[in-house]
């Protein structure tokens, strides 16, 4: 089992980046972002280094799943209030692991459950549509910069 858990040959890709400038403001869409030990520069949740929810990531495929549940053609990633949309790698399999995006290293700390804002942003049923599809949270281990199109790689020696 340990060998199976350590096998992550897939390399993901950053599809979208957004920061939350202030409470209840729309996310600001970015092509690249600077990351300090306190979080994403420009994000309102940037703060104390080492916090478990400094960065949020969501699976690109989950946008399609949530849209399908809500009978929508598509969903604007900004409505989901997550920082990074990733394709090509299973984020849920990365819990307690470190990932590298550009020269930034993050440690995936846990699930990112939906908040009541999902009902407001997505309409009636939005909260329940997001359950089990809300993505993951991460803390910053190494600061740097990354952009849309950059690879998302699991660092294999990082299981906690």
Residue locations for each model-derived region?
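Metal-cofactor-dependent catalytic cores
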Residues: 1-160
């Amino acid at each position: 089992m340990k060998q199976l858990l350590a096998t992550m040959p897939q390399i993901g890709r950053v599809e979208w980046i957004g920061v939350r400038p202030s409470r209840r403001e729309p996310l600001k869409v970015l092509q690249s972002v600077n990351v300090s030990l306190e979080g994403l520069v420009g994000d309102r949740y940037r703060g104390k280094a080492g916090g478990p929810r400094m960065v949020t990531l969501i699976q690109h495929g989950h946008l399609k799943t949530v849209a399908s549940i809500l009978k929508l053609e598509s969903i604007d990633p900004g409505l989901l209030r997550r920082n990074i949309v990733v394709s090509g790698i299973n984020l849920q399999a990365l819990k307690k692991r470190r990932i590298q995006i550009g020269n930034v290293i993050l440690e995936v700390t846990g699930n990112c459950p939906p908040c009541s804002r999902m009902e407001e942003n997505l309409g009636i049923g939005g909260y329940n549509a997001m359950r089990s599809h809300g993505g993951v949270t991460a803390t910053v281990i190494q600061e740097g910069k990354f952009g849309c199109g950059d690879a998302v790689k699991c660092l294999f020696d990082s299981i906690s």
